[in-house]
Structure formats: C-alpha cells, structure tokens
From Swiss-Prot:
Transmembrane segments: none
Swiss-Prot/TrEMBL keywords: Cytoplasm, Methyltransferase, rRNA processing, S-adenosyl-L-methionine, Transferase
Similarity field: Belongs to the class I-like SAM-binding methyltransferase superfamily. RNA methyltransferase RlmE family. RlmM subfamily.
Subcellular localization: Cytoplasm
UniProt gene name: rlmM
Protein name, entry field: Ribosomal RNA large subunit methyltransferase M
GO MF annotation: an example: S-adenosylmethionine-dependent methyltransferase activity
Length: 347
C-alpha cells in the first residue's frame, strides 16, 4: 500500500484527517483518510505518497506529531516469527540510517510498548545482516519506522530525518523541573523546540532581548523566557511566584493582558490566556500590525466541535488582520490539550 502515516493526539483524528485531505487536494494529489477516533494516528491513502510528503512539510502540519511515508502494511503476522515477513516486505529497499519501533500513543497502542522495545532489539541485527540498516545511526539516510497497531498488525514506513519529528512517537520527552511555576511551562518549552529550527532559536531567542507575557500568572511562560536570559514584562492581575520575580529579569504589571500595550516595540510577545480563540487571534494580530512585537507565540483554545474549521478561521483571521508579511506555523503540541500553539515571525 502507499500513503502517509501521521501520529496525533488521541481524539483529534478527525481534525488531522481533514487537514491532510484539504492540504493534499490543494497540491493536487488525490487520496482519502483511514482512521477511527482515539486511534492516535491517521493513515492517508494515496498513490503519490512520496510526492505528497515532500509538499507537506512536517513543521507546517498542525495536528500531526509525526509524518511518515508508508511502504507496507503487514496483517496476520505470526507472533513466533515477525522478522521474516518484515524482511520480505523490505526486499529491494535502500539501506536505512536508523530504526524506530513504535506504537500509537493511545489506550489501545500503549500496551504494545513492551513489544516495540523487545522487538526492536531483535529486528536491528537482522536488518544489519540483510544489509538494510547501517551499523551506526546515520541521520542523513532515511529512517525506518515499524509501527505496531496490534501484535499481528504493523505498518512499515520511512522518514526523512530533516522533515520529521526527531523524537519517537513524535513526542519530546521534556522534564518538568521542580522550580517551574506551573505545568504550562512545558508548552512554551516544547513550542520553542518544535516550531523553531535550531538555527532560528539561536537567532531569535537571545540573552538581553525583551518580551511581554500576557496573562502571565503564575509565571510558567515568563520563567521559561528568563531561563533564556530574556527580560520579561509579565502582565496579569494575579500573582507571580516569588522566585520568578527574584530572577531580576521580570517586571510584573498588574493589568489586563488583553488591553495593555508596551511603550516600546518588543522582540517577543507570548500569550496563554483562556479566552475565545477568535478574540485572541484578533488581539495577537493587533500586536503584530501595530509593531508592538516582532515575533509572537500564543495559544488558541479550541471548541469541542468543528475544531478544524475554527483553526482555519482563526489563523486566516490572524494573518488578514496582522497586515504584515509573516511566517506562521501552528502545532497541537504534546503538552497542549484542547488547543493549538501558534508561532508568527516577521519576515
């Protein structure tokens, strides 16, 4: 079979299926999505999978944690010998630079974690013996993924390491440090890691830069920025954790983050306020249009229904009202829930 395999947050399969269908149609490639709610993945079946993968960049996909090109689907695998059918399915393939054996991040998929770990240890030497895997990881060569959907059902897929998530299952394993004011700190940590390339992070998040955090209390996002030695104006009527203020990099203004504006242009504005997504999109657009910030990261809380429609509407609204040339990326991060995180950078 041929198609794209994309992992997602369980429950958001319809949104990912809609996104893949719309984006594939836009680039002129026919196909259809195969999925069930809470599976934690979507299989987009199409004849031109490699061409579609090249046109749908991983960082530009909103609801996909990972993007892979399927090369085979194996059903009815004998649990006593899973290696032989996999080697047969890979006959004629080029040598891979790495192997990841995975499972969906779902209630049905998580019990397969033990199988994935143990089978990876068995498959790796067999692939090397067959000349299908390099002796050491080679990131410049395609990466082989074996995704178990059940003990006797697996998808074989390939990833371009330059255009895919660099973490198994597409999940960055971030540790919540004891001094973090709230779990929301993980959202901004992941956003900086996922939405920006390493080169962009080095260029755009530098010590001495100035930022605003709207709706900052208790200070999770502010704290993440101070760890990058960024000076932060934290705007919230609520209190910040004392140790955040003690960094010497934070000015706490007790004000409404929705109405406050800076006296001078800032390098960054970040916002994780619980508010209607269209209202947030409009306010964020005002910040960009008025030149109050050069770059921004903000969250949009999605409704329970028509989440893909609301996502498109809010992003279109933001870009139209910003009235500037922008590079916009959006992602439902692992640490997001019913929301997406948006990055906008001035061109």
């Amino acid at each position: 079979m041929s198609g794209l395999l994309c992992y997602c947050r369980p429950g958001f399969e319809p949104e990912l299926a809609a996104e893949l269908s719309v984006r594939a149609a836009f680039v002129g490639i026919a196909g259809y999505a195969r999925t069930q709610r809470n599976d934690g993945y979507v299989l987009f079946v199409c004849d031109e999978a490699a061409q579609l993968a090249a046109k749908l960049q991983w960082r530009e996909l909103i609801f996909a944690r990972q993007k892979l090109v399927v090369i085979a689907e194996l059903k009815g695998i004998d649990p006593k010998d899973r290696i032989t059918p996999i080697l047969a399915a890979l006959d004629g393939q080029q040598r891979f630079g790495d192997l990841w054996v995975e499972h969906p991040d779902s209630d049905a998929g998580k019990p397969l974690a033990g199988l994935a770990r143990s089978f990876g240890n068995a498959l790796r030497p067999a692939l090397r013996k067959a000349g299908l895997l390099t002796d050491k990881p080679q990131p410049r060569q395609p990466r082989l993924h074996v995704c178990f959907l059940d003990g006797d059902h697996a998808l074989l897929a390939v990833a371009d390491s330059a255009d895919s998530a660099p973490w198994p299952l597409g999940i960055p394993r971030l540790k919540l440090l004891p001094e973090a004011p709230s779990r929301s700190a993980l959202k901004l940590d992941e956003a900086l890691l996922t939405l920006l390339t390493p080169e962009e992070r080095d260029a755009l998040v530098k010590p001495g830069m100035r930022a605003a955090d709207l709706g900052a209390a208790p200070g999770g996002w502010t704290w993440v920025l101070t760890r990058q030695h960024v000076h932060v104006t934290s705007v919230d009527n609520g209190p910040l954790r004392e140790h955040v203020l003690e960094t010497g990099l934070v000015e706490h203004l007790r004000a409404d983050g929705f109405h406050w504006k800076p006296a001078q242009p800032l390098d960054w504005m970040v916002c994780d306020m619980v508010e209607q997504p269209r209202r947030v999109a409009e306010r964020m657009a005002t910040w960009v249009r008025e030149g109050w910030c050069r770059n921004t990261i903000f969250n949009l809380k999605l409704p329970m229904k028509k989440r893909w429609d609301e996502t498109r509407l809010c992003l279109d609204l933001f870009e139209q009202q910003a009235e500037r040339s922008l590079s916009v990326r959006a992602k439902q991060l692992y640490h997001d829930r019913e929301e997406i995180t948006v990055l906008a950078m001035r061109d």
